[in-house]
Amino acid sequence: MGYAIAEAALTEGHHVTLISGPAFVQPPRNANLIPVSTSDEMFEAVHRDADKCDICVLCAAVADYKPANVSSTKIKKRGAKFSLELIPTRDILDSLGHKQDRQFVLIGFAAETEHVEENAVKKLRAKHCDIIIANDVSGADSGMESDVNEVTILFRNGEKTKLSRAPKKNIARELVKIFSNFATKMFDKKNVTIN
């Protein structure tokens, strides 16, 4: 969804910074691409650029855990079993949501396999997002590895909007309109203009 949203935003005339891990899809040509390889690089890049944004959309499926120790050499086989210690990665969405001086609209994604809306609302509140996009990724025909999606957009004021199953490019165009309208209303209250 990230690349589709970036493309839709560019089509609408927005300036787009795309912070992306390795992907099989070509990034939009006119986006300012910042390539990253690890969750730590993603965290640092997002924090470096977030305050330059009017709208910050976090839809990358960043791993929740990473190896505690990284080996620069091959780990030799030592027996039948091997345990790998994992530690939590830094939570990018949570850290941005809790910034005291945040001036941008914060939009997160909740890819869920059960209790989709309920879990998304919890994430919206816990991470202090303005909007969260909930999508059910339990089926093979929708979500991350599919060209189609259907989503529920949940707003911090309790409102929600559903976008029915459609190609991701269509969903992305609708999301960009919703994000822009939300930001315009929010910034109008603060007497600020979005670029």
Regions found by a protein language model. Name each.
Residues 15-17, 32-33, 54-56, 104-108, ...:
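Structural motif
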Residues 101, 116-195:
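Glycine-rich phosphate/adenylate-binding loop
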Residues 7, 11, 98, 177, ...:
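Short, well-ordered alpha-helices that flank and scaffold nucleotide-derived cofactor binding pockets
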Residues 1-2, 88, 92, 171:
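Catalytic-loop motifs flanking and including active-site residues across diverse enzymes
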Residues 21, 60-61, 154-156:
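Generic beta-structure capping elements
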Residues 23, 113, 158:
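Short, glycine/serine-rich, charged loops/turns that create anion-binding
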